[in-house]
């Protein structure tokens, strides 16, 4: 059964000064899938995510759940679309649990309900033990996990219309929490029929957790396919200038990118 398209962008272009960041991108994302946006530094991954999320405003054609982006009120869309940025500039001395509870602002819930939902996602992202810590005193990875819990809280009451966007969510995390974050994202997609779009640099992490890979290079999509189809020595060489061999994980059976020499 074909999955419904919940987010579509057509002919998306973006230019900063004289630099063409994105060039006529056509892309669609479905419910229940994890899509990794990949590519070298400067390929346009984060810019595409910001354009799709509305963080960068545009008059170009973007649709959420079949409805033009410009037709959505911000408050209504925030119940269905959550964005985890690469970093946060929050400096106010909130307690960690208060940061997570900020995700419930768009929701009409009692304080007890907000607390219960926030605690659920704090447990999932392994930050319960930080609940009464001051946010500014936390490490970068701890802050990132808190904000992940906040975004999951934001989407808790959105029914079957959920889009979760993660911009390099593993960049500040240790090995165990990198895998836990992507495991939670994949579980969120499958169990809640959510569309999950994640910007990553690690091809092997993407191969393990993503259903699709959209690989960009110089502002254009080079390939949009499954990990098995996208990860070839030829594509990796053309995009990254890196000679690679493709193997298989011995127990989990996903493609592994390895150095050719």
Swiss-Prot record:
Its EC number is 7.6.2.-. This is Hemin import ATP-binding protein HmuV. Its main location: membrane. Belongs to the ABC transporter superfamily. Heme (hemin) importer (TC 3.A.1.14.5) family. Part of the ABC transporter complex HmuTUV involved in hemin import. Responsible for energy coupling to the transport system. Keywords: ATP-binding, Cell inner membrane, Cell membrane, Membrane, Nucleotide-binding, Translocase, Transport. The complex is composed of two ATP-binding proteins (HmuV), two transmembrane proteins (HmuU) and a solute-binding protein (HmuT). ATP binds at residues 39-46. PROSITE patterns: ABC_TRANSPORTER_2, HMUV. The lineage of its organism: Bacteria, Pseudomonadati, Pseudomonadota, Gammaproteobacteria, Vibrionales. It comes from Vibrio vulnificus (strain YJ016). Residues 7-243 form the ABC transporter domain. InterPro entries: AAA+_ATPase, ABC_transporter-like_ATP-bd, P-loop_NTPase. It is found in: Cell inner membrane. One of its GO terms (molecular function) is ATP hydrolysis activity. It is a peripheral membrane protein. One of its GO terms (cellular component) is plasma membrane. Pfam families: ABC_tran.
